[in-house]
Amino acid sequence: MAALSGGGGGGAEPGQALFNGDMEPEAGAGAGAAASSAADPAIPEEVWNIKQMIKLTQEHIEALLDKFGGEHNPPSIYLEAYEEYTSKLDALQQREQQLLESLGNGTDFSVSSSASMDTVTSSSSSSLSVLPSSLSVFQNPTDVARSNPKSPQKPIVRVFLPNKQRTVVPARCGVTVRDSLKKALMMRGLIPECCAVYRIQDGEKKPIGWDTDISWLTGEELHVEVLENVPLTTHNFVRKTFFTLAFCDFCRKLLFQGFRCQTCGYKFHQRCSTEVPLMCVNYDQLDLLFVSKFFEHHPIPQEEASLAETALTSGSSPSAPASDSIGPQILTSPSPSKSIPIPQPFRPADEDHRNQFGQRDRSSSAPNVHINTIEPVNIDDLIRDQGFRGDGGSTTGLSATPPASLPGSLTNVKALQKSPGPQRERKSSSSSEDRNRMKTLGRRDSSDDWEIPDGQITVGQRIGSGSFGTVYKGKWHGDVAVKMLNVTAPTPQQLQAFKNEVGVLRKTRHVNILLFMGYSTKPQLAIVTQWCEGSSLYHHLHIIETKFEMIKLIDIARQTAQGMDYLHAKSIIHRDLKSNNIFLHEDLTVKIGDFGLATVKSRWSGSHQFEQLSGSILWMAPEVIRMQDKNPYSFQSDVYAFGIVLYELMTGQLPYSNINNRDQIIFMVGRGYLSPDLSKVRSNCPKAMKRLMAECLKKKRDERPLFPQILASIELLARSLPKIHRSASEPSLNRAGFQTEDFSLYACASPKTPIQAGGYGAFPVH
């Protein structure tokens, strides 16, 4: 403290120089007055000691300002010390004033005290001038003491809200502006994302961030304004009678006759009209606004942008995958899991499904098993709340026990009404146990539910093998197909990537897709799918040489295109589409298997993934064979493989059957010198199918159509084929399954319907 300068006065005695070694003339004058006052025997010694403590505290405050005053974000220990010294100074000054008033000679000492305080003001003005404007929390302790010496003001911030409203929030250290104003905005039907906050500085409004520490703005005035492009309007209320089950968005009670806003959908009773939020926000347009802003700040990669542009020019666009499977992907539809925080009391219940009876379209005969008297709970929010909530603050407990023992079930609600005292105690302890259990378990990956433990699958005979694994017939709650993947000792990066892709595969449900049933990691990575009783398309065409009619071949092509269109709509690239992976049931239903799994179909070196040329080269697109891009696989590469499958269907042969050199095929196809010979197609092949085959086998990737267009072309072709219609005069009994001998039971004679033709001879003919 030897460097402390600009003190509030040191005194004439040698002991007083200890507090301030560099005494200025003004400070000396003030100290001289204090010393003369102290020399007066009528002044109690306590007052003199308090004045010395005041001076010492002021010097400490000045030292803190000199050391940390110029920093924009000072350390927290400095803020704590500054607050401690200012509080101590205020208490000493109050004590001094009380003593002077009780002695009746407060005038003389007020002058000396004022001189001392003025010294602090003048000496620390340079330190205060270098403070940033955002550090207005460092107020001059002199001004605080003079304005209200007996009751120091709490740090607050005045906020002017939209629609000529205002509020006051406390300025707590470590709390952001967003957290401080969130409740006030929610009460008015607003969220921080649709507003901007400004501070008044030098008569001008300057925007600040929502994540700014509110303690830096102590004593200032903030203005919150709604963004210009936010669709904010006034309510458009109409009287409405709700014939379907509806609830008031304020009191959550049954609503039959009331009012509804045509813009935001807010419903309420007439008695609840005073609690309706003043602001009307069209959340549908607001969601689109936030999504557009997201794409502005998170641009789509160039490869995906070109892919989307190609899809749009071809008249279709691949849909995005499900939300829980993509994580950071860009092309995801925002509807499944909206990241936009919507205020609970003001979002219409039938729009965001938070009401107690979620309304949804369903069959009138289907039982409404969704009816529940407990509001749906987001598990992530519940775990977070359970982590910070005390034992007595829990309102709804959730345990890992069966539904019958849930604390929020109907049974417990009735028991709570009968005996509120004991039930409240049991509920508190139950929630405490659940909270501890949730902390122990942590966050659980949903893909773990699809992992089949080791030993539950009985592996049977070997069916076949390929580039990526070996297929076995197995038993797991029935017949299944088990594909043991050629990945030995997977690294953590491989295993995590494998689980991420499994998270996508487990959501595939389509009539032309093999049903994914689970996966196994021990003793090695394996995929479990449904068992297909039929044979593969390759076996039908090239092994047993089944002779299909043209109408059947076109239907097989249609089903294959339909299944691939579904996979691409889920943003799943097959990467290995061929006739070996297309299975036919006995009724000629197509099932596509071995799709996705880019992790397995790649070469790994440590934690880095590289694409490799593996699999069946006959179905590989030229860009895949060249391997010039980091990831040559795309929707169009699957289209090329589908074109080869069409070639197999329409010719009954494999392409390049006249070339026996594998390396020659790789070189010529990759360079674009070799294409399948379309002159070998069957004579009865429609010209439209031949044209479609040629388009799918284009050498340039961007010139190939996508599966929505391919499927539409095949369906149009199937409808245009001539068909033999059933004769309208054919008896319908034969179609019903009656046999010829069944009619003998009813062969009884009738005068109205004679059976034997000879009977007509008995009647005379005139």
From Swiss-Prot:
Compositionally skewed regions (Gly residues) per UniProt: 1-13
GO terms, biological process: animal organ morphogenesis; CD4-positive or CD8-positive, alpha-beta T cell lineage commitment; CD4-positive, alpha-beta T cell differentiation; cellular response to calcium ion; cellular response to xenobiotic stimulus; endothelial cell apoptotic process; epidermal growth factor receptor signaling pathway; ERK1 and ERK2 cascade
> What's the stated role of this polypeptide?
Protein kinase involved in the transduction of mitogenic signals from the cell membrane to the nucleus. Phosphorylates MAP2K1, and thereby activates the MAP kinase signal transduction pathway. Phosphorylates PFKFB2. May play a role in the postsynaptic responses of hippocampal neurons.
- UniProt region (Disordered), positions on chain: 1-38, 308-454
Its gene?
A: BRAF
Give the active-site positions: 576 (proton acceptor)
Entry EC number(s): 2.7.11.1
Q: Which PROSITE patterns match?
A: PROTEIN_KINASE_ATP, PROTEIN_KINASE_DOM, PROTEIN_KINASE_ST, RBD, ZF_DAG_PE_1, ZF_DAG_PE_2
User: What domain of life does the UniProt record list for this protein's source?
Assistant: Eukaryota
Q: Which residues form the Protein kinase domain?
A: 457-717
Q: What is this protein called?
A: Serine/threonine-protein kinase B-raf
| Family recorded in the similarity comment | Belongs to the protein kinase superfamily. TKL Ser/Thr protein kinase family. RAF subfamily.
Q: Which SUPFAM superfamilies match?
A: Cysteine-rich domain (SSF57889), Protein kinase-like (PK-like) (SSF56112), Ubiquitin-like (SSF54236)
A single cellular component GO annotation: plasma membrane
Crosslink position(s): Glycyl lysine isopeptide (Lys-Gly) (interchain with G-Cter in ubiquitin): 578
Q: Which UniProt keywords apply?
A: Acetylation, Allosteric enzyme, ATP-binding, Cardiomyopathy, Cell membrane, Chromosomal rearrangement, Cytoplasm, Deafness, Disease variant, Ectodermal dysplasia, Intellectual disability, Isopeptide bond, Kinase, Membrane, Metal-binding, Methylation, Nucleotide-binding, Nucleus, Phosphoprotein, Proto-oncogene, Serine/threonine-protein kinase, Transferase, Ubl conjugation, Zinc, Zinc-finger
What catalytic activity is recorded? L-seryl-[protein] + ATP = O-phospho-L-seryl-[protein] + ADP + H(+); L-threonyl-[protein] + ATP = O-phospho-L-threonyl-[protein] + ADP + H(+)
Q: Where in the cell is it found?
A: Nucleus; Cytoplasm; Cell membrane
Q: Which cofactor does it need?
A: Zn(2+)
Disease field: Defects in BRAF are found in a wide range of cancers. Colorectal cancer: A complex disease characterized by malignant lesions arising from the inner wall of the large intestine (the colon) and the rectum. Genetic alterations are often associated with progression from premalignant lesion (adenoma) to invasive adenocarcinoma. Risk factors for cancer of the colon and rectum include colon polyps, long-standing ulcerative colitis, and genetic family history.
* Phosphoserine: residues carrying this PTM: 151, 333, 365, 399, 446-447, 729, 750
Annotated Low complexity bias:
314-341
Could you cite one Gene Ontology molecular function of this protein? zinc ion binding
Residues annotated for Zn(2+) 2 binding in this entry: 248, 251, 269, 272
